[in-house]
Amino acid sequence: MSPRSVASLSTLLICVHASLVAAHDFWLQPSEYWISQEALTPMTLQVGHGPFRQRSPIPARRITRFQAVAPGGTVVDLHEQLRLGQAAEDGNFRFTAAGAYVLVLQTDDRAQAHLPSIRFNDYLKVEGLTPALEQRERLNQMDRDGSERYSRCAKSLVQVGPAGTGPQGQVNKPVGLPLEIVPEANPYGLAKSASLPVRVIYAGRPLPGALVKLTDLDNDASPFEVHLTDRDGRAVFTMPSAGSWLLNVIWTKALPRSEETDFETVFSSLSFGFPPDHAFLQTSAYGRED
């Protein structure tokens, strides 16, 4: 996507009614992304950006998967650690082995959204949902109200121990979500890359033409960077080195007329972040030098 296209899209993202856009961004937010072994770490489920950001009110019955993929590839069920709606957290986790963990959360697809035609069309344009736009245009339905059923998927990268300690390979592997963002460079790796290439996987295959947004969660009124995936489902972002960050993507497909809604949509995110003093933690916060 050209700089001019990105600028135009960013303007559109800001101009569209904020509550419409913010309502669809959902992610896992650990209190810290870099933790020591055995540290009990709280996390929350977040939704929205800027002034519309809040704890997600999603009920526990809708969460079908909450796991951690450990550095060695073992899958740990974290369902019992959910504490939705508590005053300060929605759950917690504790890991013993050093390395990079992938937190994984998935919901069912029983939620529905019904919007007037103008708002639905704006939403489709902002999120780059071309299958829905093309169908509505082809069937002369741009003036009709729109509806979708939807599910949410979220991943979060957690590093246990200093940078580079323990296995890191799970960061770059899909975890079997219906829609997911797979980083092809490790944000937590010792060999720091200037770019962050990612691949979007939908229904087990690379997804071309998807709009992927990178947001600085400390300055989250609008995305920091936006790209469309290429024919291989890839997009390349600037690699962050400080703060908390969110990548998110949305995709949809048309449903048969016999269904209650017009489309089935999946919202997917990947969150990651760095300690306040990244360089210091790499050498001394865990009591040794590498």
Show the residue positions of the predicted features.
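N-terminal signal peptide c-region/cleavage motif recognized by signal peptidases
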Residues: 16-18
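Beta-strand-rich domain onsets/edges
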Residues: 24-42, 133-196, 201-206, 218-220, ...
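N-terminal, post-signal-peptide region of Sec/Tat-exported proteins
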Residues: 44-82
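Structural motif
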Residues: 50-57, 199-207
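Glycine-centered loop-to-beta-strand initiation motif
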Residues: 87-91, 229-243
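Short acidic/polar inter-strand loop motif in beta-rich domains
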Residues: 108-116, 253-258
